[in-house]
């Protein structure tokens, strides 16, 4: 069976959106039950990121990292990922879509909740990058905070 690029993009975007919805609903259920949620959620998402990062090829440069996560191929399509600059020291990608933010907003999360959920979800990104000790990752802008895109920055340590 052949899948078009649009079908692939829509399917992966939908899966990421479902993951975002699940995160939101779990946190809401924990809150309703009177459970503190942030610390266990942060730990679980960080560990999930570590597991994801462990499956990726080794990388010691931003280019190798982005190639390893498929940023330069079809894997970036659901996020409308755009390479801005990548050199030996730093790589910057703009992600023009975030299916998780879309899910949270569709479920009625307040702007403050969306920012908080994004910060929690970022623990997964930090877990992933932790598997690459030569690299760091941060987001200068985020769709959750109202920016036009998420600016993913991966840099070499030191």
Predicted regions and their residues:
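Amphipathic alpha-helical segments that form well-ordered structural scaffolds
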Residues: 120-128
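N-terminal accessory segment detector
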Residues: 1-120, 134-149, 153-158
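A structural motif corresponding to the C-terminal end of an alpha-helix
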Residues: 128-134
